C-alpha cells in the first residue's frame, strides 16, 4: 500500500504514523487557519518515527539555513512574534546577524562580548520552556493536547482533531517560549554578566532554570552588573545543584583552565625567576638556593596561574633545636661550617634571629628588583603585607593587554638536612599510597621560615616556623602513583569549594586556607584505602563530612607534627561559617 502526503506528494512513508509525523512537522497550520501549508525539498528518514528536513525555510522571511525544526521554531518565536490584533505573525525589523540559527533579538544594551553568553542561556531556557508546556499539556488530560514522545499523534484522532490539536500545541509553545524569555530577562540572564576571567578566555556557564535560589542569593542576581567580580565557579555555585553528582561536575568544570594562558603565565614567571637568580648571584652576600613550592608544582592548581611561591634559602649548614619549643616551631643555630655569612644575624647564644635574617633577605630582594640590569623588575610592584608575614610579595605585570598580573611570593628560609630530630615529628610511613622512594625523598630535608609564634613564649624572638613544603610537594605530587586513583582530584575539588566559600563571603573567611586543607587531606588519605576513580563521589562526601567535623571541633593535626593544631589561629566565628557551608553542600 502506498501512503502519500496530500500536500507535497511525498509517498515513501512506511506507516500512517510516519505520514502523521510528516504532516504535523512539515505542514503546520497556516496563520489564517484555512488549511495546510506545503513544504518542499524533504527527504526520507531511516525510520518512520524520525523525519529529518533537508531544507527548512521560514515562511515569513525566506531564511533557509536552519539545521532543525527547533531552530525554525525558535526563529519564528523570536523574530516574528504574533501581532496584537491576532491576525498572525509579523516580521521583525532592526535585528542584526547571529552566529546561530536559533538566535533571536537581544536587548539593545548587550555588547558583542555578552552576546555569546546570553545566546546560549536563552536557547537553553527556550528548550526547557517548550518541554514544560508539553508536560503541562499531558497533565491536563485533554486528547487535543496530547503529543507523543516521537512526535506522532494517537491513531484515534481524526483529521479534524489533528488540525485543532496542532493549532493549540503551536499556540501553547509560543506562549511558553515568550514566558520563559520574559522571565529570563527579568531575573538577569547569566549571559548579561561579564566575569573577571573573560580577559583570559573564560566563559560563564548558563544557569539551569530548575536551580532554585535562596532569598540571600536572589539579591545578588537582581542587579547583575553590580555583582562583585569573581571566578566563574563562584557564579555557578551561587545556585543549588539538583544533586551532589551534578554539583561535583560543576566544580570540576570550573577548574579547567585554558592551556595556552597557563603556559604563557608559567613561562613568564620562570623567566622572571631565572633572571632574578642571575642578579641575585651578583648582589647577594649570602649564597642562596631556590625551592619551587606551591600548588602549581604539585599539580593541584585550581585556577589561573596567578600565584607562585618560591623559597630562597641560605646554602649554609644549619641545625634545628627543638628544646623547649612549642610543636611546629624550633630554634636555629649554626652547624659545623666555616662560612661566616650569617654571623651578623646570630645572637650571643649562637641562635639565628628570625627578624634579622628576614630583614636582610628582604633588602636583597629589593636591591635585585630595583637593579637597572633586571629589566623585568621594572614591571613589578611591591605589595603591602602584614608585619608578621614571612613573604616578600611582588605583583608582576606580564606586559600583555587583558592579562592580569601575577602574585609572586619570595620567602626567606633555612634548609635543614634530614628529618626533625624530635619525638613530636612523625616519620612518613610507606604502605597504602606512599611507596618507599617517595617517602625517602620526602624526608630528605625540611625548612624553617620567619613566621612568628602567635602566643607568648620565653623564646618568641628566636622561634622559627617549621615548614614541610618539600615533603608536601613530594607526597601530593605522587599521591595517585600507586593505584592511579582520585586522591589529587578530591583534594582539588575541596580546594575549589573552599575558594567558593571565601568568594561568597570574604569578610567571614580570612584565616582558613589551602594549607589547612592540605594537612587534612594527607591524614584523610591514610585513613581511607579505596580511592579508585569510581569511588570519587563517595570519597568526596566522606571528606566533606570529616572536614566539617574537624573544623567544628577546632582541630586539624599537622600531618608531620600531630601535636601541632593548624586550626589554632582560625577564629571560632570563622570556623562556624566554614562548617555551615560544608554541611550545606551535603543537604
UniProtKB/Swiss-Prot annotation:
Domain of life: Eukaryota
Name of the protein: Cyclic GMP-AMP synthase-like receptor
Nucleus as UniProt keyword: no
Species: Magallana gigas
Annotated keywords: ATP-binding, DNA-binding, Immunity, Innate immunity, Magnesium, Manganese, Metal-binding, Nucleotide-binding, Nucleotidyltransferase, Transferase
Family: Belongs to the mab-21 family.
Gene name of the record: cGLR
EC numbers for this chain: 2.7.7.-
Matching InterPro entries: Mab-21-like_nuc_Trfase, Mab-21_HhH/H2TH-like, MAB21L/cGLR, Znf_C2H2_type
Amino acid at each position: 500500500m502506498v501512503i502519500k502526503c496530500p500536500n507535497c506528494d511525498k509517498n515513501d512513508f512506511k506507516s500512517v504514523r510516519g505520514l502523521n509525523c510528516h504532516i504535523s512537522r512539515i505542514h503546520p497550520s497556516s496563520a489564517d487557519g484555512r488549511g495546510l501549508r506545503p513544504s518542499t525539498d524533504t527527504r526520507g528518514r531511516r525510520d518512520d518515527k524520525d523525519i529529518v528536513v533537508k531544507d527548512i525555510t521560514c515562511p515569513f522571511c525566506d531564511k533557509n539555513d536552519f539545521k532543525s525544526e527547533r531552530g525554525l521554531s525558535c526563529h519564528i518565536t523570536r523574530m516574528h512574534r504574533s501581532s496584537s490584533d491576532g491576525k498572525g505573525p509579523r516580521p521583525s525589523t532592526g535585528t542584526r546577524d547571529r552566529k546561530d540559527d536559533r538566535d533571536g533579538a537581544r536587548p539593545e544594551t548587550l555588547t558583542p562580548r555578552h552576546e555569546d553568553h546570553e545566546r546560549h542561556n536563552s536557547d537553553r531556557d527556550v528548550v526547557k520552556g517548550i518541554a514544560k508546556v508539553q508536560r503541562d499539556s499531558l497533565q491536563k488530560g485533554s486528547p487535543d493536547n496530547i503529543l507523543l514522545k516521537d512526535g506522532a499523534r494517537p491513531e484515534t484522532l481524526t483529521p479534524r482533531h489533528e488540525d485543532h490539536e496542532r493549532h493549540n500545541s503551536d499556540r501553547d509553545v509560543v506562549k511558553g517560549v515568550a514566558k520563559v524569555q520574559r522571565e529570563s530577562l527579568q531575573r538577569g540572564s547569566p549571559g548579561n554578566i561579564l566575569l573577571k576571567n573573560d580577559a583570559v578566555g573564560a566563559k560563564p556557564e548558563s544557569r539551569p532554570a530548575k536551580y532554585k535560589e535562596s532569598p540571600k542569593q536572589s539579591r545578588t542576581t537582581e542587579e547583575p552588573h553590580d555583582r562583585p567580580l569573581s571566578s566563574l565557579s563562584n557564579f555557578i555555585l551561587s545556585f543549588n545543584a539538583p544533586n551532589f553528582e551534578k554539583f561535583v561536575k560543576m566544580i570540576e568544570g570550573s577548574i579547567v583552565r585554558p592551556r595556552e594562558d597557563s603556559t604563557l603565565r608559567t613561562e613568564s614567571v620562570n623567566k622572571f625567576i631565572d633572571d632574578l637568580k642571575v642578579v641575585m648571584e651578583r648582589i647577594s652576600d649570602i649564597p642562596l638556593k631556590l625551592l619551587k613550592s606551591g600548588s602549581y608544582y604539585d599539580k593541584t592548581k585550581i585556577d589561573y596561574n596567578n600565584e607562585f611561591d618560591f623559597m630562597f634559602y641560605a646554602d649554609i649548614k644549619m641545625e634545628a633545636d627543638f628544646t623547649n619549643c612549642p610543636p611546629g616551631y624550633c630554634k636555629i643555630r649554626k652547624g659545623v661550617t666555616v662560612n661566616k655569612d650569617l654571623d651578623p644575624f646570630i645572637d650571643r647564644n649562637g641562635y639565628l634571629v628570625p627578624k634579622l635574617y628576614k630583614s636582610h633577605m628582604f633588602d636583597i630582594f629589593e636591591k635585585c628588583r630595583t637593579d637597572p640590569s633586571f629589566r623585568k623588575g621594572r614591571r613589578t610592584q611591591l605589595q603591602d603585607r602584614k608585619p608578621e608575614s614571612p613573604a616578600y610579595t611582588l605583583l608582576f605585570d606580564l606586559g600583555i593587554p587583558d592579562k592580569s598580573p601575577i602574585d609572586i611570593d619570595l620567602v626567606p628560609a633555612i634548609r635543614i638536612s634530614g628529618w626533625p630530630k624530635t619525638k613530636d615529628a612523625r616519620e612518613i610511613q610507606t604502605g597504602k599510597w606512599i611507596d618507599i622512594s617517595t617517602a625517602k625523598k620526602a624526608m630528605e630535608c625540611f625548612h624553617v621560615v620567619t613566621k612568628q609564634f602567635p602566643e607568648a613564649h620565653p623564646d618568641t624572638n628566636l622561634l622559627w616556623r617549621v615548614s614541610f613544603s618539600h615533603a608536601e610537594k613530594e607526597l601530593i605530587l605522587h599521591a595517585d602513583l600507586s593505584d592511579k586513583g582520585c586522591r589529587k582530584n578530591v583534594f582539588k575539588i575541596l580546594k575549589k569549594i573552599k575558594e567558593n566559600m571565601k568568594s561568597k563571603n570574604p569578610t567571614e573567611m580570612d584565616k582558613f586556607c589551602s594549607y589547612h586543607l592540605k594537612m587534612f587531606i594527607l591524614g584523610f588519605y591514610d585513613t581511607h584505602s579505596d580511592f579508585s576513580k569510581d569511588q570519587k563521589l563517595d570519597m568526596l562526601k566522606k571528606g566533606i563530612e570529616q572536614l566539617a567535623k574537624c573544623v567544628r571541633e577546632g582541630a586539624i593535626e599537622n600531618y608531620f607534627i600531630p601535636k601541632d593544631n593548624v586550626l589554632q589561629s582560625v577564629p571560632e566565628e570563622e570556623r562556624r561559617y566554614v562548617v555551615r557551608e560544608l554541611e550545606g553542600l551535603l543537604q
